[in-house]
């Protein structure tokens, strides 16, 4: 079986939106594959591969950040109203790009309390916590966005 990651090259440019633990790990891994990975945070960092994005304060990345972007991973949680902050502030910009792939990092919490049973993508979501309902709503927003999205739970 061919490894899909093997088709990545230094021509690929990733934006990792929300660079906590998972986003940082993803960016580090992508860089090891020879790709460019720029990461967002809510405050300025000394890292030249980092940029500021804060949807609550409406601090939007400079247009130049998006030049040549081929892939996006969003790790940013829902806002207090349960909407996706990336789509709320950047939807039109993202739709104007020639993206090959968009990933949205969700949670297995959308499956609800399975009392230890295994779940997979064939299981129906059944959230019981408010934050899981919000995540499920964001998943739906991404799916309906028309972008080439893949949901990770």
Where on the chain are the PLM-derived regions?
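Conserved beta-loop-beta element that borders a ligand/cofactor-binding pocket
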Residues: 140-153
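Hydrophobic, well-ordered beta-alpha structural blocks that scaffold small-molecule cofactor pockets
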Residues: 1-63, 74-75
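Active-site YXXXK catalytic motif of short-chain dehydrogenase/reductase
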Residues: 131-136
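Active-site regions of enzymes building and remodeling cell-envelope glycoconjugates
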Residues: 47-57, 89, 116-121, 148
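Conserved Rossmann-fold NAD(P)-dependent oxidoreductase catalytic core, especially the SDR/UDP-sugar
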Residues: 91-130
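NAD(P)-cofactor binding segment of oxidoreductase domains
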Residues: 67-104, 137-140
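Short glycine-/acidic-enriched loop or helix-start segments at secondary-structure transitions
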Residues: 26, 49, 82-86, 90, ...
